[in-house]
């Protein structure tokens, strides 16, 4: 009874049960089991534990699994110490009563059935295994079998929560407090509530709270609905690009492709159909008038001329008009392509990606947010495939700008760090790698290159400035021996500002004199650092309420003074590689895999047929009208 008294005292004092129960030896567990065999249902200890109805045989069977050290084995080799600690805590607080009720099992099965909304894919084996355990929990042969099923269901719950919310290791780390309670101990409460039937709210609690994840959820649902409707067919390839105003047999297929993904609306189709009918009606009226007159004059040539003016359906139907071109431009903008409305190779490739491929890419993006974890209340997010850098605060995008990242051969590294300071009007100390690859070839061709571009050359061995004309630029050690230092100014490679987060990669955010490159859709041009379209705006955003730093920066910029300004608070910065993001309009952006790291893009195998001229186009016109009306 000693363990009971300790537990009751601790419970009344508000101390976690886990701190007591997890510290008890197996022998103490055994003594506790023997003592509790005679405990009545009305035990005050049980009343303090949510008034749970006692099944002493089940509680004893669960406790036996603790004593026999089978508990961890039931969770499997993949279970973390944190998960095991939390599970032990949950059962200890219940005095080993089973977690899962009828409602809880139903809720777990419902959560398994709807887990796809979180971008999680469960196999048939997973679903079947959980279903069998749910049945065994209440219909197992004896108490031991039912107890084992209950613990296995708890293990499945932890696995499901990890799949939805990401790794749970941090949720199970012990704190250094007196109670030694597990961190994120609310998972014990969530497990308790799930066992009573509220699994859905537990899933919502552990799911990533990042705005991007939640917007990706909505887009996942939208693209799954598109897939359920049959997706789209690939547009046939051709030797020549299709430009606005041209006629092409692929135009009807392009129109259908735009409709399928929502870029070309029912209203657009209905308006275009109405336009054709209006043209036809006008010409028919004119033809009747001319025919009447020719009856009186018997001038059949005029009649033929009027009839010849009737709009040709086939030509009209395959004309790449302005409305469709606008839809293609919107598609290009949302896929990181040059926005010109031209159906060229890159646009055609993006159009022909299958809807299933896009669904998988959205899921992969959701997986990223699961693995990334909490990025902080205020952070800078620089994403390579989207060529953007953004400032986020309280789950809101507050600043966004175009960015330039490393060439595929000099890829920008993916990592997280903290911004500490900025430098106004910086000098640029060219890294040895850039000197060897870029500067030495220029110097070999023209030694005046350094002076023309504002570089001072320093001999690393002597520390002295040297004249370019006196150096053997063909020497094997030229790249490592000579340091290139570029003075501040309009041509400085770092622009007017650099933002520093000390790291092993020597990567930072900075400006650039080559601002014209920001107009390019694909912006992998740097040697690894991140060039910002508006570095000053980003630095001011990082400063936040640190008005002194903001004033110091602005003063240094105004005076063209080289100055380091330390921020009052460090701000996390995350350089990532995610090929699907969601813009403020709520629509997904599918970026090109610029570093070929995902290799997950799949093309649609079904190819749309080319349009064939119709002698009787009435059926096609009727179909257009019905499609338009049906999708309004």
Roles of regions detected by a PLM:
Residues 2-3, 29-82, 155-159, 178-185, ...:
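Well-ordered beta-sheet/strand-loop patches within structured domains
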Residues 6-8, 15, 99, 108, ...:
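Hydrophobic alpha-helical segments and their boundary regions
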Residues 2-30:
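Gram-negative bacterial Sec-dependent N-terminal signal peptides
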